[in-house]
Each structure stands twice: as C-alpha cells, then as structure tokens.
C-alpha cells in the first residue's frame, strides 16, 4: 500500500509540470502581443492605458526568467510604483503605479509614457535576445 501511494505521488510530480506553466505557445503569443501593444500605442493615452497589460505579461513571464532579468525589471518597476500597505501588509494587488491615474498632469503623463516605453523595451528584449 505504501509503495503504491509513493508511486502515485511520484507520477503526479512528473505529470504536473506538463499541465501547468508557461508553454512555448504562450510565450510566442505574448511576444506577438508585446509587439502589437508597442506598435499600436501611438498616442500618450493609449500608452498609459496599455501599461497594465505589459505588467500582466511580465507577471506571466516572471517564473521563466533568469534571476538577473527578474531583478533588472523588478528594480525598474519598483522605482516607479508605491507599495500600498495597510497595517504593514500589502493590499491585494500589492502595488499601485505612481504615474498612472484617471486624470494625469502633463508632467506625470510624460513620466507614464516614459515608463511604458522603457518597460515595453525591457520586456521585448526578453523575447528577442
């Protein structure tokens, strides 16, 4: 009985990575989506509105990246976001962009556009190089 249970657990460990994760197809789809986002974001408002989608793609890609790549992009993102902490614990979602909002001043809009362009460039490099 013990050996059959152990064998079953071992089989599940071998099979589970095949069912979960970030497949090559997912990576290719995200690569195309990054290129599409960058190409279609012509004006400042569309760039600002597309920033969250870039961050979502980065979060999906995160487990497959090298430690150096993760630290590089995390440092960049953390410099441009504030942690929202209640009683020392981040709220669900954890971070809020400093530079993105419904009404953005011209100076903040420039920062938001710069953030979008730099983040898009960093993520696109992960797919091309």
From Swiss-Prot:
Residues linked to a glycan: 49
Domain of life: Eukaryota
Keywords: Antibiotic, Antimicrobial, Glycoprotein, Immunity, Innate immunity, Secreted, Signal
Annotated InterPro entries: Turandot
Location(s) in or outside the cell: Secreted
A Pfam family: Turandot
Signal peptide boundaries: 1-21
Primary localization class, coarse: secreted
GO terms under cellular component: extracellular space
GO biological process: cellular response to heat; defense response to bacterium; innate immune response; response to bacterium; response to cold; response to heat; response to mechanical stimulus; response to oxidative stress
Assigned protein family: Belongs to the Turandot family.
Role, per record: A humoral factor that plays a role in stress tolerance; gives increased resistance to the lethal effects of bacterial challenge and stress. Regulated by the JAK/STAT pathway and NF-KB-like Relish pathway in the fat body, upd3 in the hemocytes and Mekk1 in response to septic injury and consequent immune response.
The protein's name: Protein Turandot A1/2
Organism this protein belongs to: Drosophila sechellia
Origin organism lineage: Eukaryota, Metazoa, Ecdysozoa, Arthropoda, Hexapoda
Gene name per UniProt: TotA1
């Amino acid at each position: 009985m013990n050996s059959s249970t152990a064998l079953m657990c071992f089989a599940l460990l071998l099979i589970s990575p095949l069912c979960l994760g970030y497949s090559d197809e997912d990576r290719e789809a995200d690569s195309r989506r990054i290129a599409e986002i960058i190409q279609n974001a012509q004006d400042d408002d569309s760039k600002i509105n597309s920033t969250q989608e870039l961050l979502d793609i980065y979060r999906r890609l995160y487990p497959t990246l090298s430690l150096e790549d993760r630290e590089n992009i995390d440092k960049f993102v953390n410099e441009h976001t504030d942690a929202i902490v209640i009683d020392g614990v981040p709220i669900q979602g954890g971070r809020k962009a400093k530079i993105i909002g419904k009404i953005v001043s011209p100076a903040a809009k420039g920062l938001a556009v710069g953030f979008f362009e730099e983040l898009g460039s960093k993520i696109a490099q992960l797919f091309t190089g």
